[in-house]
Amino acid sequence: MTLGASRGRPIILYVVTEDWYFLQHRLPMARAAARAGYKVHLATRVNKDRRTIEDFGFALHPLNWRRGSLNPLDIVSIVAEIRQLYRLLQPDIVHHVALQPVVIGSLASIGMPLAQLNSFCGLGFASPQLKTRMVGAALKALLPRLTNRPRTIATVENKDDKAVLSAIGLRPDRIFVLPGSGVDIQRLAPLAEPQGAITAAFAGRLLVNKGVRTLIAAHDLLSKRGVQLRLLIAGGPDLANPTSIPMAEIESWKRRPGITVMGHVSDIADVWKLAHFGILPSRGGEGLPMSLLEAAACGRPLVATDVPGCREIARPGINAMLVPVDDPSALAEAISRMASDRELRRQFGQASRRIVEAEYSSEIVGREVVVLYDRLADRHPDASPENRP
């Protein structure tokens, strides 16, 4: 007998590449689903977070997932593994989180009458900077065939990504804008400005696509001009990502005056306690950057690049300054202005917090995603989130 044959509450199965990613980016969403009466299951590669996940009451299904691998044997293996889980569990809803699970999970479900929610957390395949453009072209051809199925909807994290997916053939009436899981505004409260030297912070994985090299170059320009700025870099490399910064280069940053490489930080509030403003010079492919959301929740003004995702939360003249991609000079100028104007930082920081409270709290986003789950589970088949396009 399958697990699904003797269930009480409807089962929702999250398919995610890594356990840490689920905890960082989808935990509030899963907890909202549990509060709404769903039994939460998670299929993922388990690193060190099994106990934490199970303590939340979620059923865990370990996967032998090799994130980022394009080896056909690896792909066939993980598709078969997930398909077997679908057959055993018979979930009421499958929620594929991020591009690789969307593709792999959709392949695994071919021929199965599963209700599916496909969450696109940024569209790296649509970027001209993608290293392997053939992969991007193949995905653009494949995605409409995989995702335009009955009882299947998609979410994106910004309006630009909705337009891209619609342009390649996904049905626009089945694409909803949903900003990840939002941010916990109780845990991340507004912080007073720190005392001492003006400090800017970058928080995130150390990837080329995050624009960290541009940030280092901008800091060099400021140093040459005599601008005293302390730069914190919180985060580490991601060895499974082809754009990860080499360790030798990261080590070289530690030797530069005015730069502190903090590595992974367990409590992100510890970063924003030390920083006067947040920076993300992304090169594109973002959904809605969690680092900017968290900085804004803590009442920090923002400096970011003018790319989809960043400009959703970093709003020029309101709470942020936006600069062109790969432009160290423009970035240095924005950093210098933010560093020199305390009143501007105060106004922008207050606006950041207001934006998060009004639009991006995990409570608001949790209610919105439950509406989509209920629609897929036929609890409310015509429902859709009301406050986002």
Each language-model region and where it sits:
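Donor nucleotide-sugar binding/catalytic pocket of nucleotide-sugar-dependent glycosyltransferases
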Residues: 61-62, 140-190, 202
